[in-house]
């Protein structure tokens, strides 16, 4: 890590956290307005992130495969960093996000999660928790909203094994109960923004581009083993390809 990289990371973090704080404070009245206004806040937040990456880190964002953006689906997103949570909220037109329960207790921002219709769950994967998640997801789908879930349940290191961070049954339960296609989503954001890292590493991306790719949908009707196998295979294969290109 060079001193230049440290300075760039510091400037990016100041940009992102300062503007995020300003956004959530200025937009507080949106918590009492129709859902459209929360949708607008999400898109602005995503834009703040994208502009900060461009200005301070020299990174572009490439979206590969946007043919599902006008459909109601379940987005099963690879989880490597905080980046995809923020960016995908704007990209996927404010989907209903499956989040860990602790996030709704964050000062002020927790209210935004709730107003946005996020579904807080206990990550124990208990049957009761899964049933509550499914019930709330079905209500969102009836309103025409897509669902966003992180199948491994937590942010994982870039080179981690699925033996250590398996694809959890919660995503299959959602798929089987909601009966809509699942779109696997792969990306390489973990290379520049590792889990819990204040320091960002733009030089880890040889192309200077964070790529997010929407893969072919998994149709309804598969059994648990076949579904999880296909989801893991598609997501991990494409994620590894994108990472290898940057090394």
Task: Report each predicted region and the residues it spans.
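A membrane-cytosol interface segment of integral membrane proteins
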Residues: 118-141
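Catalytic core of membrane glycerolipid acyltransferases/transacylases, capturing the structured
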Residues: 20, 24-40, 56, 71-126
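Short acidic-hydrophobic, aromatic-tinged amphipathic segments that line or gate anion-handling sites
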Residues: 63, 119-122, 220
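Membrane-anchoring hydrophobic helices of lipid-metabolizing enzymes
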Residues: 1-73
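Short gly/ser/thr-rich secondary-structure transition/capping motifs
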Residues: 55-62, 130-131, 194-197
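A cross-family acyltransferase "interaction/gating" segment
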Residues: 108-110, 145-148, 159-226
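Short acidic, glycine-rich surface-loop motifs adjacent to enzyme active sites
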Residues: 151
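Short active-site segment of divalent metal-dependent hydrolases/proteases
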Residues: 155
């Amino acid at each position: 890590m060079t001193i230049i990289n440290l300075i760039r990371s510091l400037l990016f973090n100041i940009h992102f956290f300062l503007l995020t704080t300003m956004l959530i404070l200025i937009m507080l009245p949106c918590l009492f307005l129709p859902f459209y206004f929360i949708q607008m806040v999400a898109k602005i937040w995503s834009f703040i992130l994208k502009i900060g990456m461009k200005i301070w880190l020299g990174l572009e964002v490439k979206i590969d495969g946007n043919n599902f953006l006008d459909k109601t689906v379940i987005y099963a997103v690879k989880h490597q960093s905080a980046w995809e949570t923020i960016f995908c909220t704007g990209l996927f037109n404010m989907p209903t996000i499956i989040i860990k329960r602790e996030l709704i207790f964050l000062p002020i921002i927790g209210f935004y999660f709730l107003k946005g219709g996020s579904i807080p769950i206990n990550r124990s994967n208990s049957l009761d928790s899964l049933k509550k998640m499914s019930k709330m997801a079905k209500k969102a789908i009836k309103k025409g909203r897509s669902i966003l879930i992180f199948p491994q349940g937590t942010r994982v290191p870039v080179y981690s094994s699925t033996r250590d961070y398996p694809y959890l049954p919660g995503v299959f339960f959602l798929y089987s109960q909601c009966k809509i296609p699942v779109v696997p989503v792969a990306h390489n954001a973990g290379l520049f923004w590792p889990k819990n890292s204040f320091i960002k590493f733009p030089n880890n991306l040889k192309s200077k581009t964070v790529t997010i790719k929407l893969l072919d949908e998994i149709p309804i009707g598969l059994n648990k083993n076949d579904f999880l196998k296909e989801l893991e295979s598609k997501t991990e294969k494409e994620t590894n390809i994108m990472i290898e290109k940057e090394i």
